[in-house]
Amino acid sequence: GVMVQYPGDGGRIIDYRNLVQVLHSRGIPVAVAADIMSLVLLVPPGQWGADVVVGSTQRFGVPMNFGGPHAAYFAVREMYKRYMPGRIIGVTVDREGGKALRMALQTREQHIKRERATSNICTAQALLASMAGMYAVYHGPDGLKRIASRINQYANALRDKIIELGFDETNNDFFDTLRIRIPASLSVEKIKSFAVEEGINFRYFTDQTIGISI
């Protein structure tokens, strides 16, 4: 199989339709890791042939929480529904060096009494899923479109100002992420130092470009 990101890693929106057609003609399924907020405005992956779509629901009203926890979403075509795993059994080695099987991934990992549990991060994903779901219900389709459109408008306003300042924005099509090319005359390290002082978190690529997400 093949997995692609939508929008791409650097923020660019890529039209994968031709790629998906070629892959499907060779019997290769396509999975997509997609930003759920961008899907409010973009053509859904299922409409251009994706077989599996996954991603995080954090952007639907869930705080960053220093990186987690956040609930995920996982969607497949009808033909793959029975292949969605409830539990995945992995191969490992026991203490005597022999081959052993163990549960490597499952939807619920707590098999001890609540009083003895030291964490509840796995089963607590239901709370995050409920928060994201109710965020969508509360705002409704029109409200979500207004939110996503406002994010995109902010990104476009920032892009216009950056171009006005003489910088090159390399993402022709984007939702909320810009990739700015820094001239050789400017030091990326100086920009990074200034950004840290101002509490601004940029992404620094190795090709003299900087990523900015709204």
Set out the residue ranges of the language-model regions.
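Generic serine detector
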Residues: 25, 38, 56, 119, ...
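Conserved PLP-enzyme active-site core in the AAT-like
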Residues: 1-100, 162-166, 175, 179-182, ...
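Conserved C-terminal alpha-helix-loop-beta "cap" of PLP-dependent enzymes
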Residues: 142-214
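Residue-level recognition of alpha-helix initiation/capping sites
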Residues: 13-14, 36, 127, 142, ...
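Active-site C-terminal subdomain of aminotransferase-like
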Residues: 60-165, 170-172
